[in-house]
A protein has these predicted regions:
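Short, solvent-exposed beta-strand edge segments and adjacent coil->beta transition regions
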Residues: 143-144, 200-202, 239-243, 305-307
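Hydrophobic alpha-helical scaffolding
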Residues: 150-151, 205-207, 247, 312
Length: 331
């Protein structure tokens, strides 16, 4: 019997997750909830400016949307309390609105009848476990009803931190995410609480903050106070990278670092960490389901200072980890 899920919030992550789950052998989407109208959302499922045209027939009716004749319910509820997940026998709700991050808000899905909730963002509270697959998923014991899948950048950076720490130990780290623009920004100048993000997304390189540094200390509590970071938004719609500079405990060579990443990509982090020695650019990682594509050409070392770079499709890579987290926790 397939695992039944609901997607609450049908933006970039919600729609990419939906596309990835079409024809999945063990997970099926039952219902979508979003305040936008069904006709528009059906169109955006079919036609995606980044990931292309879905090779399926997509339409809508009075109760939902259809893909190749398969029907998916579509609700328009603003309040989680108005959703009846129990009557639909929902196993998982993927909370991807970007609005609900507290325990009380997320637990409303459990009260509504869902068995588990996956949050597609870092949690704002310590009572919800934040997980990066391949790095700290051993903290899960099966009793959790709400789990945070962290952020796309956290999923990208954490495998690199893991490999470097196991290789030579870490004293401090600073991450810089060179990130594609997102729907949090506007095409033209618009008011925003972050005055840099108030500027047109397609016109400038935009220095900003990143929540990944804080989230990473939930993944690696031993590095609390030792990881900093910032974000640089750039005028591309998808495809990002994280540049991490480490102060390490012992001197290490470029060859040692690259060899460690190559081994990890082929063994314990396979499917999460990819490895390349090719001179790639951001467009080359679009569609890659790995959390991190390690760029061996960009590794550099000065004594005990190490710099590594990992690319990521901040949409598809992250959405793929949500699926993997469901598969892991439904066992």
């Amino acid at each position: 019997m397939k695992t039944r899920i609901a997607i609450n919030g049908f933006g970039r992550i919600g729609r990419n997750l939906f596309r990835l789950l079409l024809n999945h052998p063990s997970i099926e989407v039952i219902v979508i909830n979003d305040i936008a109208d069904k006709k528009t959302m059906a169109h955006l499922v079919k036609y995606d400016s980044i990931h292309g045209v879905l090779p399926s027939t997509v339409s809508d009716d009075e109760k939902g949307i259809l893909v190749d004749g398969k029907h998916f319910l579509f609700f328009h509820e603003k309040s989680i309390s108005n959703l009846d997940w129990k009557s639909l026998d929902i196993d998982y709700v993927v909370e991807s609105t970007g609005k609900h991050k507290t325990f009380e808000e997320l637990n409303a899905h459990i009260i509504a009848g869902a068995k588990k909730v996956i949050l597609s963002a870092p949690s704002e509270v310590d009572t919800i476990k934040t997980v990066v697959l391949g790095v700290n998923d051993s903290i899960l014991d099966g009793t959790e009803t709400i789990i945070s899948n962290a952020s796309c950048t956290t999923n990208n950076a954490a495998p690199m931190i893991k490999v470097i720490n196991e290789l030579c130990g870490i004293e401090q780290a600073y991450i810089t995410t060179i990130h594609s623009y997102t729907t949090d920004q506007s095409l033209h100048d618009q008011p925003h609480k972050d005055l840099r993000r108030a500027r047109g997304a397609s016109q400038s390189i935009v220095p900003t903050t990143t929540g990944a540094a804080k989230a990473l200390t939930k993944i690696f509590p031993e590095f609390d106070g030792k990881i900093g970071g910032c974000g640089i938004r750039v005028p591309v719609p998808d495809g990002s990278l994280t540049d991490i500079t480490f102060n390490v405990k012992r001197a290490v060579t470029i060859n040692e670092i690259n060899a460690a990443f190559k081994i990890a990509a082929e063994t314990n982090l396979k499917g999460i960490l990819d490895y390349t020695e090719d001179p790639i650019v951001s467009v080359d990682v679009i569609g890659n389901k790995n959390s991190c594509i390690f760029d061996a050409q960009l590794t550099s070392v000065i004594d005990k200072m190490v710099k590594v770079v990992g690319w990521y499709d901040n949409e598809i890579g992250y959405s793929s980890r949500i699926i993997d987290l469901i598969l892991l926790t439904k066992k």
